[in-house]
């Protein structure tokens, strides 16, 4: 009996020692996690300043469509990441995509009052979808606090190909540089091959643009061409 009692006592002591080791490890893991979170928070604050809360998130996509087009939005960058023409197909009967995720990128440069330069492409927006009798409205909101934000507002008419976009700032004066009177835009897009003959498609591909006060101009359709625009343009389009 004495031997059995000694073995039981030894087993209990070992069990209690193991529990203490596991408790200490759990405390150490918790402290490490807290430290890592604090470090991540400090990194976000250093990089994004006022926009630190929008610097972390999970990319999510959702689609909005009317009778003619289907647009896919991403909360990362607050942008349209894919556009499909309904009721039309490519030469091989696949859906006619103007661009798909990975083909295009859109971002705006923000100059903040705390001397940071931030691109909206890396920030996470809150999507707000609403409807009127004439259109669906997708508002992608970039919030600084509960009462200060920048909205990217997309209006998709019920029966039209054209989608409008406008940018509205609400109570952002103290967060943006006082010299901010416009936003620099970065737009890149790969032109997809939707026709069977690549040579034919390349022959007629071109880019059109219109200055604010001048007529429309275009790059050459028949040769490689480029142009650096110095003035403001009202719109840019390609085919």
Q: Where would I find each of the regions flagged by the language model?
A:
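Accessible peptide chain termini
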Residues: 1-2, 239
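Long, low-complexity, compositionally biased polyampholytic IDRs enriched for Lys/Glu and Gln/Arg
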Residues: 2-38
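Short, Gly/Pro- and small/polar-rich lid/capping loops
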Residues: 26-61
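Soluble non-transmembrane domains of integral membrane proteins
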Residues: 45, 52-239
């Amino acid at each position: 009996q004495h031997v059995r009692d000694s073995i039981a006592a030894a087993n209990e002591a070992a069990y209690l020692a193991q529990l203490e080791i596991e408790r200490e490890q759990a405390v150490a893991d918790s402290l490490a996690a807290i430290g890592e979170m604090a470090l991540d928070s400090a990194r976000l604050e250093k990089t994004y300043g006022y926009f630190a809360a929008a610097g972390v998130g999970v990319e999510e996509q959702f689609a909005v469509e009317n009778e003619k087009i289907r647009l896919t939005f991403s909360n990362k960058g607050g942008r349209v990441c894919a556009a499909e023409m309904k009721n039309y197909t490519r030469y091989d009967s696949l859906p006619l995509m103007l661009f798909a995720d990975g083909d295009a990128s859109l971002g705006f440069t923000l100059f903040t009052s705390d001397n940071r330069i931030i691109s909206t492409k890396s920030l996470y927006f809150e999507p707000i979808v609403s409807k009127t009798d004439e259109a669906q409205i997708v508002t992608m909101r970039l919030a600084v606090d509960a009462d200060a934000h920048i909205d990217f507002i997309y209006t998709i008419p019920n029966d039209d190909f054209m989608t409008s976009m406008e940018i509205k700032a609400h109570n952002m004066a103290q967060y943006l540089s006082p010299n901010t009177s416009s936003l620099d835009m970065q737009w890149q897009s790969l032109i997809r091959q939707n026709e069977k003959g690549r040579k034919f498609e390349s022959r007629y591909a071109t880019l059109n643009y219109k200055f604010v006060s001048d007529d429309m101009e275009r790059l050459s359709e028949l040769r490689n061409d480029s142009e650096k625009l110095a003035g403001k343009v009202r719109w840019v389009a390609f085919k």
